[in-house]
Amino acid sequence: DELYESKIVYRTKGFEDLVRTFCMNPKGVVVNENTNGIVTVNGHSYEDENKHTENTNFALLVAKHFSEPFKDSNGYGESIARLSNMLGGGVIVQDMIGKNLSELDIPTLSATPGDLSLVMPKRILDGIIEMIYALDKIAPGTANDDTLLYGVEVKFYNMQVEIDNNLETRNKG
């Protein structure tokens, strides 16, 4: 039997951040996504076998909860995505060891070879790399030299919704 999508959560050693797999796409492709004029990376699989690839792609999301007085986590994520757009004209791709890539190395997405450490905060990128090596222990080959890292994918979540005593929000409708 084949397992289509694994949900794996890892706690990093240094900061105890939670890193999780998201949106696994066996035989999938990496694609650009445009949200409010910001180009980010995403992925999907096709049902049509003619569109299958030899690759599996998935996102690794690092959960970050900020302390007071910080209130704009969506703005923080958006600024990281905008920095990727500024440095790479959109999505940046690098291999696991950070060497320069050729066009032949980039299989399914038009992306700019670059250095994600110039875009992502160290703590977040370290968590992603640590998770990849942890995944390699249960899925050998995950941390190979031909593993490509695309960035950035940002998910925007509102962690709290204000409700009244009737469990209703201020938004009517």
Where are the model-predicted features located?
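Residues forming the flavin
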Residues: 1-173
